[in-house]
Amino acid sequence: MDLISVLALWPYLLPVVAGGAVWAMRRSFASTERVERLENRMTEMETRYASIPGTEDVHEMRLRIAELSGDIRVLSQRVQSFSHQLELLLENAVNRSNS
C-alpha cells in the first residue's frame, strides 16, 4: 500500500482515529452525573458549615466565659459570707434557747 492510496482513505480513517482518541480520553473527563453529585455534596457541606462559629465568634465566647468566671467567683464569696453569717445566727439562736 503506497502513500497515495492511504491518503485517499483519509475521510474514512479520520473519524475512526478521532473516535479512538475520544474513547481513550473518556476516563480523563468527569461525567455529568459525577459532577452533579460533587456539586450536591459541596452544597450540603456549605449549608452545614455555614452555621459553625468563626474565629471572631469563638474569641467573643472566650471573653464572655472569662467574665462569667469572674462573676461566679464573686458570687461564691458572697454565698460563703452569707453562709458564715447564717451559722453565727443559728449559733446565737441555739445559745439563747439553751439559756
From Swiss-Prot:
Quote the cellular component terms of the Gene Ontology held in the record.
host cell plasma membrane; membrane
Q: Which Pfam families match?
A: DUF2730
Membrane topology classification: Single-pass type I membrane protein
Induction is noted as:
Expressed in the late phase of the viral replicative cycle. Expression of late genes is activated by the viral late transcription activator C.
List locations, semicolon-separated. Host cell inner membrane
Q: Which InterPro entries match?
A: Phage_Mu_Releasin
Q: What is its main location?
A: host cell
* Alphabetically ordered keywords of this record: Cytolysis, Host cell inner membrane, Host cell lysis by virus, Host cell membrane, Host membrane, Late protein, Membrane, Transmembrane, Transmembrane helix, Viral release from host cell
A biological process (GO) of this protein is: viral release from host cell by cytolysis
Coiled-coil ranges from the UniProt annotation: none
The UniProt transmembrane annotation reads 3-23
The UniProt record lists the keyword Transmembrane helix: yes
On the tree of life, the source organism's domain of life is Viruses
Q: What does this protein do?
A: Facilitates the release of the SAR-endolysin.
Protein name (database record) = Releasin protein
Q: Which organism is it from?
A: Escherichia phage Mu (Bacteriophage Mu)
Q: Lineage of the native species?
A: Viruses, Duplodnaviria, Heunggongvirae, Uroviricota, Caudoviricetes
